[in-house]
UniProtKB/Swiss-Prot annotation:
Residues noted as binding substrate in the record, renumbered to the chain: R90
Source organism per UniProt: Staphylococcus aureus (strain JH9)
Residue stretches in coiled coil: none
InterPro entries xref list: Ac/propionate_kinase, Aliphatic_acid_kin_short-chain, Aliphatic_acid_kinase_CS, ATPase_NBD
Regions crossing the membrane: none
The protein's name in its UniProt record: Acetate kinase
Family per similarity comment: Belongs to the acetokinase family.
Positions that bind ATP: K16, H207, I208, G209, N210, G211, D282, L283, R284, G330, I331, G332, E333, N334
Residues holding Mg(2+): N9, E385
Free-text comment on the cofactor: Mg(2+). Can also accept Mn(2+).
Lineage: Bacteria, Bacillati, Bacillota, Bacilli, Bacillales
Length: 400
């Protein structure tokens, strides 16, 4: 029998939701509540393909969930709140405590709160959503799905930093990795498209959006990933620097008189494509500017692609080869130019890709861009983290 599952992504003043019919993975409705706790909160819900928007004051997440459930009934999406069978909550950081998704109990809630020091901007906000749903829908399973969980299969040699070992033991300082739900979804989907068990494949997954991370997935398990202790590490991103020499932080502080917090803010919000180009963090703007002859915008795009290119070579070495390269997320799914730059010169690894196929895969289209004879397959897959969340609610919420 079909189940109705809510996939939830709660921010400090927002709540993103999708109602999904399982196991069909059919989207019933989706929407967004913005400006929670502020004046003129905005509630948007999709009804029969049309967006319905209302503006009203919503004081907290409990009221936001209440309004959402009322809207479901008002638009005949459900007859009764008991029609909802389970909820799945995106939680950014599960640390080492949570190697997989978990049914939420009071104890789990407490542990997520304790992990907030590892994700101070996200975990407390994710908890607001969890608490609101547990309060208003107390009789159904609620499941936490962690961005970090998929990467908990990394071996020590991949996740340890070359620091005094007691820093890891005392403070949990290590690589955690993020975007795990997306990497897991696309690796499973790539295996389906190839009609091979994921256990038999070596996959390099490139989740490239405003935030970007690359993952080495060997036999269905993450064995390395580009993000680190925080999502600041790895490749160049929209506004994040990615990897830099750590000695630059005190150097910048000395030269500019800025505090460590201010430098960290610059690395997170003023660097990456924005910092390099000086104009925008949006790849579409930079592509237009580069076409019109802006050298700095072109340079920013070149740096961005070269960092991803380098990780592909590195992860192919880590897995002693590669069978599939996956592109996903906003840029990975839509930027013909970045895919081409990233794949350039990889023929020595057995990557032969078709420029025509590359040009045709845009706006949510899924498919292969390699030539049929290419030993390494290259595939574009629109990510669907919400379906992955719903699958985990079915599994870990005991609904199968």
């Amino acid at each position: 029998m079909s189940k109705l599952i809510l996939a939830i992504n709660a921010g400090s003043s927002s709540l993103k939701f999708q109602l999904i019919r399982m196991p069909e993975e059919e989207l019933v409705t989706k929407g967004l509540i913005e400006r929670i706790g502020l004046k003129d909160s905005i509630f948007t819900i999709e009804v029969n393909g049309e967006k319905v928007k209302t503006v009203q004051d919503i004081k907290d997440h409990v009221e936001a969930v209440d309004i959402m459930l009322d809207a479901f009934k008002a638009h005949n999406i459900i007859n009764d709140i008991n029609d909802i069978d389970g909820t799945g909550h995106r939680v950014v950081h599960g640390g080492e405590k949570f190697p997989e998704s978990v049914a939420i109990t009071d104890e789990v809630e407490k542990e997520i709160e304790e992990l907030s020091e590892l994700a101070p901007l996200h975990n407390p906000a994710n908890l607001m959503g969890i608490r609101a749903f547990r309060k208003l829908l107390p009789n159904i399973p609620h499941v936490a799905i962690f961005d970090t969980a998929f990467h908990q299969t990394m071996p020590e040699k991949a996740y340890l930093y070359s620091l005094p070992y007691h820093y890891y033991k005392d403070y949990g300082i290590r690589k955690y990795g993020f975007h795990g739900t997306s990497h897991k979804f696309v690796s499973q989907r790539a295996a389906e498209m190839l009609d091979k068990p994921v256990e038999d494949l070596r996959i390099i997954s490139c989740h490239i959006g405003n935030g970007a991370s690359i993952a080495a997935i060997d036999g269905g398990k993450s064995i390395d990933t580009s993000m680190g202790f925080t999502p600041l590490a790895g490749v160049t991103m929209g506004t994040r620097s990615g990897n830099i020499d750590p000695a630059l932080i005190p150097f910048i502080m000395e030269k500019t008189g800025k505090t460590a917090e201010q430098v960290l803010e610059i690395l997170n919000k003023e660097s990456g494509l924005l910092g390099l180009s000086g104009t925008s963090s949006d790849l579409r703007d930079l592509s237009e500017e580069a076409e019109s002859g802006k050298a700095r915008s072109q340079m920013a795009l070149d740096v961005f692609a070269s960092k991803i290119h380098k990780y592909i070579g590195s992860y192919a070495a880590r897995m002693h080869g590669v069978d599939v390269i996956v592109f996903t997320a906003g840029i990975g799914e839509n930027s013909v130019e970045i895919r081409a730059k990233v794949l350039e010169g990889l023929e020595f690894m057995g990557v032969y890709w078709d420029p025509k196929k590359n040009e045709n895969l845009l706006r949510g289209k899924e498919g292969f861009i390699n030539y049929p004879h290419s030993p390494v397959k290259v595939v574009v897959i629109p990510t669907d983290e919400e379906s992955m969340i719903a699958r985990d609610v079915m599994t870990f919420g005991g609904l199968k």
